[in-house]
């Protein structure tokens, strides 16, 4: 209970200082070189193993060991929970055979189990190589709240002169979450025009007239229909890998699209320009997408 992000980072750091490989979501892996050493041994068909401590946001600890022996690759997982008073106990264990494992140029360890695990994606992954604090923070602020499937805005090129082309009703759901920090709730299935247009015009260089043309405005109701996003499985996600602070106060973000399902740590690259405002909000001004694969099946 009350396990903060700061506490999570501190546990990862303490485990790292003690010599263990440790990681958490949005936290760089400590002693990541041991994972690279393991993979190099695996590629050379040498026996090897490495243990990784995964600190979860709820305070649980996952201990994941990769073992390569005589051509066979397995993981042995131990889940550790806590009793009252802080006493640890083993909550569950699991041994799984791995069908294949890949280490990408940017440092993603991607692996696939021979048998499907319930509530698990087809491919699993760990971010091994560290990211800079600046790029990680820019990812959190400008990229983590958007999608690279389900709508076209961040998998196509546009600017202020063509922004109307990317307007879709389902865009509002993510922009609302970015703005409020909460998921949208509507009992009637309609969103008041004032709120809808205010948020859309804040985060995109669009006019009220453009929004009304493209997003289903109902003049009689003075509202827009709520269009729920049904998330695409195995969708790519973005990470900022470089950035430029421009003289006009805007920031140009270089955003790589990571597609774990296709074992690609850079399926496409975006040059995304954002304009930060003094109150902490911002606006997406333009996007330039460059794809490095002809297979864009993750794009609706």
Write out the residue ranges for each language-model feature.
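Mature, Sec-exported extracytoplasmic domains of Gram-positive
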Residues: 1-300
């Amino acid at each position: 209970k009350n396990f903060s992000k700061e506490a999570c980072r501190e546990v990862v750091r303490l485990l790292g200082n003690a010599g263990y490989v440790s990681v958490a979501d949005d936290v760089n892996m400590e002693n990541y070189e041991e994972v690279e050493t393991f993979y190099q041994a695996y590629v050379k068909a040498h026996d090897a193993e490495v243990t990784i401590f995964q600190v979860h946001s709820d305070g649980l600890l996952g201990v994941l060991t990769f073992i390569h022996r005589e051509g066979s690759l397995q993981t042995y997982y131990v889940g550790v929970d806590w009793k009252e008073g802080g006493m640890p106990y083993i909550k569950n264990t699991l041994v799984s055979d791995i069908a294949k494992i890949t280490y990408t140029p940017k440092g993603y360890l991607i692996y696939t189990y021979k048998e499907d695990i319930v509530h698990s994606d087809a491919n699993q992954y760990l971010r091994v190589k560290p990211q800079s604090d600046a790029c990680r923070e820019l990812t959190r602020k400008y990229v983590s709240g958007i999608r690279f499937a389900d709508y076209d805005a961040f998998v196509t090129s546009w600017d202020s002169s063509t922004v109307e082309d990317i307007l879709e009703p389902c865009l509002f759901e993510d922009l609302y979450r970015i703005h409020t920090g909460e998921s949208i709730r509507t009992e009637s299935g309609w969103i008041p025009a004032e709120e809808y247009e205010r948020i859309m015009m804040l985060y995109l260089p669009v006019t009220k007239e453009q929004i009304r043309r493209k997003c289903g405005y109902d003049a009689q109701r003075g509202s827009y229909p709520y269009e729920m996003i049904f998330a695409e499985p195995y969708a790519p996600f973005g990470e900022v890998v470089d950035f430029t602070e421009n003289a006009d106060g805007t920031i140009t973000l270089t955003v790589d699209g990571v597609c774990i399902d296709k074992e690609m740590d850079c399926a496409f690259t975006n040059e995304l320009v954002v304009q930060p405002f003094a109150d902490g909000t911002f606006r997406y001004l333009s996007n330039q997408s460059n794809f490095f694969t002809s297979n864009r099946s993750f794009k609706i």
